[in-house]
Amino acid sequence: MNLFFCNRTIEKGEIRRFIAWFIFHHGTARTTQMVERLKVLGFRHATKAGVSLSVDDLKIPPSKRWLLEDAEEEIQFTERQYQKGKITAVERFQKVIDTWHSTSETLKDEVVQHFLQTDTLNPVYMMAFSGARGNISQVRQLVGMRGLMSDPQGQIIDLPIRSNFREGLTVTEYVISCYGARKGLVDTALRTADSGYLTRRLVDVAQHVIIRETDCGTLSGISLMPMKDQDKIIFSLEERLIGRVLAESIYSIQEKKYVARRNQDISANLATQIVRVKKNNIFVRSPLTCKANRSVCQLCYGWSLAHGSLVDLGEAVGIIAAQSIGEPGTQLTMRTFHTGGVFTGNVAKQIRSPIDGIVHFPTILQNQMTTTRTRHGEEALLTNIDVEILIQTNAEKSVQLKLPQYTVLFIKDGQFVRSKQLIAEVSSKNKKLQSVEIASKYVTSDLYGEVYFDNLVLQERKGGYGNRMNRVGQHGGLLWVLSGRIYELGIELPIMFQAGDLVLFGCILAEQDIATTFGGILKIDFFEKDSFARENIDSKRIHLTDSISSYNKKPINATTRAAENSSLNDKNVDIKIFNSLFTLQDVKVYHFDSFRIKEDFIKEKVKDYYLLKSLNPAISKKKRFENTSEKKKTHIDSTLKRETNDQGVSYNGHAAVATTNEIKDYLFSNSCNPWNLELSSDLKVKRDQVIGKLVTEAYLTSTGGIVKYSGILVERYDPIKKGYKVLKGGILLWIPEETHKVKRSTVRLFIEDGDYIPKGTKLLPNVVSKHAGLVNISQTNDLYDEITIKPGEIYTPKDGKQALEKHQCFVQVGEEIVDGLIAKELVYLEVINKPVITNRFVDKKNDVVRETQEDFIKGSENKEVVLLIRPVVQYLVPDNRDVPIPPGIHNIRNNINLKAIQFIRYQDGETVSSFEPVELVQVSLAIDLKESGQKTAAIELIPIQDNDMVTTSSKHINKSKKPYDKNLSVKEKNRNRVTQILSLDKGKLFEFQIGLFESLFIRSNEYIESNSQKNICRLLAKNGQYVVPEDSIAIKEVIGKYSGEVRQSEKASEEERSFLIMNESDHITLSLKDSSKNLKLGDLLHKEDFIAPGVRLPQSGQIIQLQSDQVTIRIARPYLVSSEAVLHVNHGDLVKSGDTLVMLIFEQAKTGDIVQGLPRIEELLEARRTKGLKPLPNNLHDRLESLFFQCRKKYGNHRAARKSLEEIQLFLVNEIQSVYKSQGVSISDKHIEVIVRQMTSKVVIEEGGDTTLLPGELIELHRIENINKNVSIHAQYKPVVLGITKASLNTESFISAASFQETTRVLTKAAIEGKTDWLKGLKENVIIGRLIPAGTGFNEHERISSNMSNIYNDLGYVINPIYEKEKNKVEEADFEDIIFEDNRTPKGFRLKDEAS
């Protein structure tokens, strides 16, 4: 081999090419040795050089400072233009973004140039540009500037990071850079999952694509061209050709010979020769046009890229394709800047003047230009044709510049330009059609004031951004906000001024009397905001009850009086006027801190008292205060005893104290009438709301039993009251029986089914019976048994039939039971069919019957009919109106009554399984309000006048919030457990009071803004005072905090009540010596406008006063509104700083560039129709339909389907390829083609014709073409593009589809259709556990097939030649497995004798 010298710089790309060349010429073994030597050489030189990175190696280019200064200056100019209303918020934003992006890119180039000019051996430069470590982007951040970052929503933050890591970041820059860093981490985490799922879907759709044959014989193919992005080639033709097979022969005219033949595979050398002969449209074979059924042939696929030779038969190319596309998914990074799409990632191509000179336009251009507005809000000219312009320095020197169509010119004819000055920009209109998306930007007000429209024409219409879209005129207009202070007053407040009035600081702007409607006794609370959290709560908030009963009213302390006499501007005020009261006398109070304690207390200590478990769970269990530590379960102390006397019931005992996060519940009992009332503090009650229950044992049973109604009428079941409301009284019949539920196989039973046991018999190890009776053991479910003891007498009747007729019947007193037995009381008869073992007999002394039975059963089994005579308990249920209720005292107005409501807990015939007492009827006490109106009933606890009614002893005495709390219990301090003894002496009375009241709650910040005005509420009445209807109780006043002129909003209505006061800070006065400008009152002037020689406006505004020597201007702020913008305000509206004024609508380009990361790839592969509930413009389905419609006119239905599918296939391949290429990811075209083939292989039937197909059915294109050949009336169909998910679910193998998604649906559908799975793919065979038909398994499959043919030959069968011919005719190769039956000849075979 001759040595030769190659004079090139060895960098990453060059090494790659060199190694590829070496492999091709010298093979793998020698290449391995060469690469090893290359590595050693590299390490040796790196060691000698001692390349390391130090801080001094990070050299910042000196040009950075003036580049940033230029950018700052440009942005300040843009900001001034925006403040003047010359450009919109969108244009300002885009200008700022573009300026900083351009600066950052320029600085990047400066960094590279600086290294080249100063130190080419700089370690940073060598590492980054050799490709060893790092890249230019990271170098830029180290020594240039970090640039723009995006926020979590993907919008660019228009504040760039000017510093680099060498200089160090400021705090603000660091926080902004954290946005991007965090976004990067989150994106990486999410993208990994997305990429994995994408790979799974791709594998599923293509797993059955295997190389099954050598040549499908197709003459079709696709044309390959270099892939370009604008003028830049991103995928060269040579690269695209390597590994392909030619579909046509290539002839060189110059050399007069064929360079390559059809069906020849293309190597790298051959690719170079072909491109030299033919630059474009090289016709190659492709998986897209392969005729092999459900597979790809060797020649259409081409090389296996791993080996550089034709792919082997049995290669699972579908899996390889899926992995090749899915794996780089994680590399599709989101850009560090710009995911919101203000610009397209690349700065538009700019044209700058090469020399100083004067610009000359050709004459033809004068009529071929239109005025346009650039995206930065600048006026410019747009060329409609390709043109050349001339820049001339002098007569001798000139330069001609070629400008393509749709170039934006920033210069005019005859204008002088400097060298490097920007003169034009190539517009994106000349690029291929890009999909655009609609974006919006909200503009908010910078100051308080009034909205003013200037040349803004509105038009209402419905649109995508809501039902009302306000559209401005064609050229937009200005929206001004005129400065002023805003007062927002409550609707009910009468104002004390008019528009044009001058108001001073501290004057009353509005006031309102607060009057009572009904009159009554006053009760006032006032407290500071967040007073619940304060420790000194009782000094700030006073709770006083009305003086309606004779009790000691507490003296109002100094704080209260001071608060009443002064303004309550920092306090909330709660005023209640009671106008109806109903008082229950002689009520005793017991306090508990949990429902469980109360239940135990009632059950164990006070058998004749019954507690309502929950008056209203939503009210009684809610938490009113801050959360504290979880309260432990406590139990009533055993020293709580019951003592009875003539006057009532008194209790001495310990009770646990509630923590601050619990609502207290009070148990009220009346000493004369056995009523027990339970409610939460401050409870509001409604009409018919139950507040108490009758305490009685009258309806309490000893155990469970059967319920029967006699003459009782009830309503339907009430789930809230948990019972049936009694409409008409009657008698409730109760047949007692004792029921125990036991877990089977875990507990030993001491009794058997059919036993008759005495009272006190041991049933279980720790359970004895309460009654004597017949034992019945039944099975409720697989786990539990039920033991039922039915009290009663056993009797064996002489006539079994007569007894059976009396089964489950009542027998009244004096009536015959059976065999002459007469009932002494009401009994219930039940026939027992099972054997009864008993020594019990009917005795003559028995209360149930009068006569005795002479012969009795004793210790013997009776297999005949046995009668069980069961006792019945009768309960009288009166009508509701006849139930006695506790007496009460009516006060003031007699508007409240109490009424009783009865609820039966169980329905007629219901069996209650229990061994504990059961309450059958609940008698409740309810409120009966005679008047409804805007009034609420409330319950109050009033202590009767007496000395110390309640004595307490406790560890901590804490401040209380309610007077009766202090009398009843001690609040806990600092969350300590406090136990206190509560003692109610006999004869000490409390009144239980229900009242109707008006509630007036006044918040200190209820109707005004505290920074502009002050709210004062003055009380005109005192606590406990009786007021008549329409009396004033308090007065609200609004005090102004600013002086100035009142300018009422033009749109101020009764609903708004907003006013504007213009004070001194809202206007400026300028002196005018000589006003050359014609100024008028009301003129709107822009910032920096000249209003007189040498006098510039410091701020934009409106002239409100004009004199000969001075002008007063009201400060204002203009906002330019573009067309199609949605306005959120109207002319004359009052707005605050930060309020939204307008939503600007604009279009932004969506390039092939992967600005959204993986979603763009997914959008293409899933063939999405919509994005974010909006139709996706120019989507694949619309594009295919349009192509099919055009082709159908030209070629007819059948050819049009194939033609339009081919077009969409090429579009898809190129789109997906360009997306990956934009990220520097190289994927061979053939992998994408394999996947796209699966997406575009089916059509949807429109009309079935003579076929058996139904409209809407999906079928493969080649199958319907074959079917149509054999019918007279063809089926009509149209092409369809399926996303990879849908294609996976519509595959022929139901096992593969079911293992992917929607398992139940797929299997159900397959079962209904009676589908057969021929196990052709890899996935199905893996699931079944067979050898897969690919790789070595493919050859095994072929071997089995040939062996089968030999066996048939040996058996005397030969292949039928007619069948062989028919088989060859069919284009669709049939790969289905043939399952042979033993008793018949397989299809296509016949006996040798027959063949002869």
Curated annotation (Swiss-Prot):
Keywords: Chloroplast, DNA-directed RNA polymerase, Metal-binding, Nucleotidyltransferase, Plastid, Transcription, Transferase, Zinc. It is found in: Plastid, Chloroplast. Its EC number is 2.7.7.6. The keyword Protease does not apply. It catalyses: RNA(n) + a ribonucleoside 5'-triphosphate = RNA(n+1) + diphosphate. Transmembrane segments: none annotated. Binds 1 Zn(2+) ion per subunit. One of its GO terms (biological process) is DNA-templated transcription. It comes from the Eukaryota. Zn(2+) binds at C216, C290, C297, C300. GO terms for cellular component: chloroplast; DNA-directed RNA polymerase complex; mitochondrion. InterPro entries: DNA-dir_RpoC2_beta_pp, DNA-dir_RpoC_beta_prime, RNA_pol_Rpb1_3_sf, RNA_pol_Rpb1_4, RNA_pol_Rpb1_5, Rpb1_funnel_sf. Pfam families: RNA_pol_Rpb1_4, RNA_pol_Rpb1_5. SUPFAM superfamilies: beta and beta-prime subunits of DNA dependent RNA-polymerase. Its main location: plastid. Its cofactor is Zn(2+). NCBIfam families: rpoC2_cyan. In plastids the minimal PEP RNA polymerase catalytic core is composed of four subunits: alpha, beta, beta', and beta''. When a (nuclear-encoded) sigma factor is associated with the core the holoenzyme is formed, which can initiate transcription. Belongs to the RNA polymerase beta' chain family. RpoC2 subfamily. DNA-dependent RNA polymerase catalyzes the transcription of DNA into RNA using the four ribonucleoside triphosphates as substrates. This is DNA-directed RNA polymerase subunit beta''.
